[in-house]
Design a protein with these regions (language model features):
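N-terminal chloroplast transit peptides
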Residues: 1-25
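Conserved short loop/turn motifs at secondary-structure junctions
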Residues: 4, 60-62, 110, 137-140, ...
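Feature 926 captures the class I aminoacyl-tRNA synthetase adenylation module centered on the KMSKS loop
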Residues: 46-49, 258, 451-517, 521, ...
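N-terminal, positively charged nucleic-acid-binding surface of large information/translation enzymes
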Residues: 44-291, 316, 333-365, 384, ...
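Secondary-structure transition/capping motifs at alpha-helix termini
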Residues: 123-131, 152-163, 186, 190-195, ...
Length: 958
């Protein structure tokens, strides 16, 4: 009954998490001051903090029900397990700032990927004893949020943004944010994100706004912020400049328009081609390549701009012009093309802007003023045709810039905006990576890092929006300058000093800052900067910044530049780049293709643990990840496999308690071989997994844990443990309990829910209200090796090889399951022979031999082996012979089998001999590798000789 109530309770919580519902503390507006870290924010989970685990008398159900994930998560959070401990650690705190998703967002697979990867790292470092801060938050998403609310107003029939006015519109946006802004973080909780939600940040929190203002003013004081006219991406539908990240490119088929550019004072003309005829009205030159003999005689002359009323522009030579493209003559419009703008700077050309903010032609368009840019395109071409200036049109495919939010074609134009001079800051970012202060994983992204920062352009940081950080600049009527200040009072003080009387009103710049400006301060502003808070001292610089490679420059590079500028330190030690999540065919997911996967649908069907494991295992840093539902199903089955192992162990581990540390060498030495083996392999896996996670080989760590559980623990040790009796029972139970707990601890960062649930059932029988696997120490120690027994590992690997050989013979000969074989085992290794003899029950269970008929001898001569017995060479010094009576197969078939085996070994020998005869290998390979190759060759030669002898014996018996 209790379990049924629990599952219903968990399902209710899952629904709340999916919708983003539940109680949430209202975030104050910018007008509400508060301390730098703010009050603890409450959980979005509308569930009481009960222990969602089975009682001592309740057995594990037959199947794992992942609907318990939600209630388990609520319990973790209520226990404060996501908050950094106060413990000291030699390596200091582990800090990972979460990339803040847009407050308007809904969880997608990109979010799911970073949540899984960052949560794995956070859980691992907590388990290693480091105070761990995974700091979450959301971004105000200026364009997206403003656009969303504007559309909501329109759908309601409410007054528009401009009709409401700035203050009332912002009140409406804050109301939307308070009501809906918690949805994305609630959905992240469904994935098990163990972020410290008590420190959750929003980029428009008052303390964050103070940091943004401080940063802007400091940059201005150093002369790094300026107001000027430069080329920007302009979104006519949004009426603002937008960042490169908010521009998407589509391959579209358009036209290339060929026309005559008449040479002034003659009948001669230059043939010119353009894809945007409307921009002719903004031309300020025509350029040709200085090496182009066709037009050399025209350089230095003037030509007449079509449909301009006779305006003339110069014909200039410039190396940028491609002789082979179009006609080889390039119309130059510095006001509306990025490349033309650069030519204009080189050639000192004037800039003419022909567009209004809404995409219509301004007064510089002459007779076309007021027309939409695309209507103008048609009209001016028709007029040019009528004037006899048209040569031809031809189809032309090009990459067209599209506004991600507005949906329309982006217009490059020169606009007066606020810019940050990034030259010096960019050089510091280059040095930080080159000097090793920052490590980029994978290393191949370093080349792109250097290339981008060494060629960085000044950063346009102003946006013509209302929602965001309003630029801290004030203007006074009748005064040509402006006042950049931390507050209006400070601006007034500056104005007085400039001779502006107090009766003159100050007007604040209406623009807001680029969202990337505030998020560029994220690693240090979230922990108290510009104040020297205890958190700033403890958690900055961050240890790792984990994010997608697609925002390496838009966000990561800017954080590095800002961190170095304002704190003098690199904001993080490591930049870990993950790839994009693609579909099972490795194609990019898109709505048009119909292959988009909603992670919440996957969680509903398979559970968060299965999705997390599918996203991160097999992942290589920086590589895109194909995701199929078959893979998720496999990992759901992995959850079930762990669950079933726990059900098998449950009666054996009654009263078990958490291990108080790793098994030490003395205890290990007293165990039987099988137990020494599984403990040694558990320790080996723990150390390898820890090393992989420390080195950010996250997928490799998950794979190792998976393979240890499946290939060593479940498939081998659990099976042989069923044969333990007498004095071995106690050692077996100790090894089972210990090895399974190691499994749970190694898998926990990847699959936190199922592992926590099982750990509580099997290892917290006392019902300690605060004990948690999440808070348990990682099995691998820092700075100390775990106990291991190399002899036990060697013996067990050989024993496993024997079992596999016996199974292979059965499979090849089609021996019925009920038939027990009686092999003769020739084993030259006395210790291995003793193990085989002592563990005949286990051998019988796993390979279906009759223990009473098994013979173990040191040499073939020591046994009475029939000449026609089937032989299999397991390894050097280990062979198996099965009598024909067990196989019921004829000699001819056995000769054929041995012949194929001998042929394969002969090929191996030829390959090894060829390698050793190759001077390039023998002379250049490490001596150890050469010696190992010689040893392999000797072993293969011996195996071939044994097989040849067996073949000869069989031939003689025919």
């Amino acid at each position: 009954m209790r379990l049924m109530v629990l599952l219903a309770f968990a399902a209710r919580g899952a629904r709340a998490l999916r919708s983003g519902g539940g109680a949430r503390a209202r975030l104050p507006s910018l007008r509400s001051p508060r301390p730098s870290l703010g009050p603890r924010r409450t959980s979005t989970l509308d569930q009481p903090a009960v222990r969602p685990f089975l009682g001592a008398g309740e057995a594990l159900p037959s199947k794992y029900d992942f609907s318990t994930e939600a209630s388990l998560y609520a319990w973790w959070e209520a226990q404060g397990l996501f908050e950094p401990s106060d413990a000291e650690h030699p390596r200091g705190a582990y800090t990972c700032p979460m990339p803040p998703p847009n407050v308007t967002g809904r969880l997608h697979l990109g979010h799911a990927m970073f949540v899984a990867l960052q949560d794995i790292l956070a859980r691992f470092h907590r388990a290693r004893g480091r105070p761990t801060l995974w700091l979450p938050g959301t971004d105000h998403a200026g364009i997206a949020t403003q656009l969303l609310v504007e559309r909501a107003l329109a759908s309601e029939g409410s007054p528009s943004r401009t009709e409401l006015g700035r203050d009332k519109f912002l009140e409406r946006v804050w109301r939307w944010k308070d009501e809906n802004g918690g949805a994305i973080t609630s959905q992240m909780r469904r994935l098990g994100a163990s972020a410290d939600w008590s420190r959750e940040k929003f980029t428009l929190d008052d303390d964050m706004s103070r940091a943004v203002t401080e940063a802007f003013v400091r940059l201005h004081e150093k002369g790094l912020v300026y107001r000027g006219s430069r080329m920007v991406n302009w979104s006519p539908n949004l009426g603002t400049a937008v960042s490169d990240l908010e521009v998407e490119f589509e391959e579209r088929e358009g036209l290339l328009y060929y026309f005559k550019y008449g040479v002034a004072g003659s009948d001669d003309f230059l043939p010119v081609a353009t894809s945007r005829p409307e921009t002719i009205l903004g031309d300020t030159a025509v350029c040709v390549n200085p090496a182009d003999d066709r037009y050399a005689h025209l350089v230095g002359k003037e030509c007449v701009v079509p449909m301009s009323g006779g305006r003339t522009v110069p014909i200039l030579a410039d190396d940028y012009v491609d002789i082979e493209f179009g006609t080889g003559a390039l119309k130059v419009t510095p006001g509306h093309d990025a490349n033309d703008y650069e030519i204009g700077l080189r050639q000192d050309l004037p800039v003419i802007n022909i567009l209004n903010g809404d995409g219509t032609l301004n007064d510089n368009g002459g007779a076309y003023a007021g027309l939409d840019r695309f209507a103008c395109r048609k009209q001016i071409w028709a007029d040019m045709d009528e004037a006899g200036l048209v040569i031809k049109t031809e189809k032309y495919a090009s990459r067209v810039p599209i506004s991600q939010r507005g949906g329309e074609v982006i217009e490059p134009l020169v606009s007066t905006q606020w810019f940050v001079n990034t030259t010096v800051m960019g050089a510091r970012g280059v040095d930080a990576v080159r000097n090793g202060d920052i490590k980029i994983v994978p290393k191949r992204f370093e080349k792109e890092w250097y290339n981008w920062l060494e060629n960085i352009q000044d950063w346009c940081v102003s946006r013509q929006l209302w929602w965001g950080h309003q630029i801290p600049v004030w203007y006074a009527a009748g005064h040509d300058g402006y006042f950049c200040a931390r507050s209006e009072d400070d601006a007034r003080t500056q104005a007085r000093a400039a001779g502006v009387d107090d009766a003159t009103a100050l007007a604040r710049d209406p623009d807001v800052l680029d969202t990337w400006f505030s998020s560029g301060l994220w690693p240090f502003a979230t922990v108290g900067w510009p104040d020297e808070t205890p958190d700033f001292s403890k958690f900055y610089p961050a240890t790792c910044l984990e994010t997608g490679y697609d925002i390496l420059f838009f966000w990561v590079a800017r954080m590095v530049m800002m961190g170095l500028e304002f704190t003098g330190k690199s904001p993080f030690e490591v930049i870990y780049m993950h790839g994009l999540v693609r579909d099972k065919n490795n194609e990019k997911m898109s709505k048009t293709k119909g292959n988009v996967v909603d992670p919440l649908d996957v969680v509903d069907e398979f559970g968060a643990d299965a999705l997390r494991f599918s996203l991160v295992t097999g992942v290589t840093p920086g590589q895109d990840v194909p995701l199929s539902m078959d893979k998720v199903k496999e990992n759901r089955n992995f959850c079930n496999k762990i669950w079933n192992a726990a059900r098998f162990l449950e009666p054996k581990l009654a009263g078990a308690t958490p291990s108080d540390g790793p098994i030490q060498a003395a205890e290990l030495a007293a165990m039987p071989v099988f137990e020494r083996y599984i403990v040694s392999k558990a320790h080996e896996c723990a150390e390898a997994s820890a090393a992989a996670l420390e080195d950010y080989a996250i997928g490799d760590a998950g794979r190792r844990a998976y393979e240890f559980f499946y290939n060593e623990f479940a498939d081998w040790y659990v099976e042989v443990s069923k044969t333990r009796s007498g004095d071995d029972v106690e050692a077996s139970q100790r090894a089972l309990a210990y090895a399974f707990e190691v499994c749970l601890k190694l898998i926990h960062p990847f699959m936190p829910h199922v592992t926590e649930f099982l750990w509580q059932k099997l290892y917290n029988g006392a019902g300690d209200e605060t004990a948690a696997l999440m808070a348990a120490p990682y099995p691998a120690l820092e700075g100390a090796a775990l106990a291991s027994d190399a002899d036990a590992v060697r013996l067990m690997e050989s024993w496993k090889g024997l079992v596999r050989a016996l199974r292979n013979i059965r499979a090849e000969y089609g021996i019925e399951p009920a038939v027990k074989t009686g092999p003769t085992i020739v084993c030259e290794d006395a210790a291995l022979a003793a193990l085989i003899t002592a563990e005949l029950k286990a051998l019988a269970l796993l390979s279906k031999v009759d223990p009473d008929r098994v013979a173990v001898v040191a040499a073939r001569a020591d046994a009475n082996i029939d000449a026609d017995a089937v032989q299999l060479v397991v390894a050097d010094g280990l062979e198996v012979y099965l009598p024909q009576a067990d196989l019921a197969k004829d000699v001819a078939k056995e000769l054929d089998r041995l012949g194929r085996q001998a042929e394969k070994i002969a090929k191996d020998i030829a390959g090894l001999e060829g390698r050793l005869k190759n001077p390039g290998f023998a002379d250049k390979a490490p001596p150890k590798v050469v010696d190992e190759t010689r040893a392999q060759l000797a072993e293969k030669v011996e195996q071939k000789a044994t097989l040849d002898a067996s073949i000869a014996d069989l031939e003689a018996s025919k």
